[in-house]
Amino acid sequence: AWMVASQSSPEASCGSCWAFSAVEAVESAENVNGNKLVDLSEQKLVDCDPGSYGCDGGFMDTAVKYMIAQKVWPLEKEYAYTARDGSCKTTKGSFTLTVNAYKTPSSTKTLTTILESEGAPSVAVDASDWSSYTSGVHSCRSKDLNHGVQAVGIDDNGNWVIRNSWGTRWG
């Protein structure tokens, strides 16, 4: 299973992986719902999500719930990513969200089903040793979750393919 995704931007020195992961999951779900692929604003979450801490981290589930509650969300070009904490702007945006629910998968099988039918989901991983990763299959056995990414596919060997927010020079 593979999902189409918008181009990922690097989160830079701002700990906003949670915002990228949440926004990318919503973008993917919107695409599965029949909308064209859109590039939604991560910065709106960094600045405005009351359940997270901006560049100091956050939670994908509360971020998606916050987006759903807003009903309309700005595009990246309407509320651009700055890689730093900012004041919450009242920019409402021009994209009406059709996503209206958030699921937390209870198993790998459930996660696979979500990927295949509802879009590329937001997932948390232990990225403690990812700074030295260059390519290939990486085994992640820890339950110390400290980084948000997006599951975008499963390869022929059953390995998850993830989309990271560290830019094109990583991996």
Predicted regions and their residues:
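Catalytic-core signature of thiol
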Residues: 1-171
